Amino acid sequence: MNFHSYGGSSSKTVRLVTGQSVLIDPSSRPRGTCLEVESGIARVYCPCEETEGMTLAFLQSGDQLRTDLLCSEGVCVEALTDLSFHSNVNIAENSGFDAVNEWTLQLLRIRHLGNAEQRLQALFSILVNRLGRRCGQWCELPFRLTHERIGELIGCLLYTSPSPRD
């Protein structure tokens, strides 16, 4: 994984290729500004060692990441597809919608469903409805999700093959 640190004191467009991550340091950013996704899909996650890269949100074109509300260690933004975002955009005060908070609440709700099958169905439902598309009896997401990431998102381990028996 390519990883860059980004404080970003000047307003500019930042471009990341699929798989790159950037650490957003809130202490080096002007107050009252945010990042705004121009194109692509990003995963926002916590860089703290204790939370092991916990996913907070997925962002797409037009979504804003308020950097003044982040924890002191900041957050990481990972490009799930080729990504570009504007730095130091003024926060849309009257929008009434915070994409990161909305995603975090939905992911928390999914993790509290009764069993792994329910959590998996709920996860794919929200991902397809917001970021993907249905294609008959299957669905398509514009990025790859590993078994490890799916397990992290639904709060359980996923096994792709049965364990050997003696």
Task: Label each region the model flagged.
Residues 23-29, 47, 67-69, 109-112:
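Short histidine-centered beta-strand/loop micro-motifs
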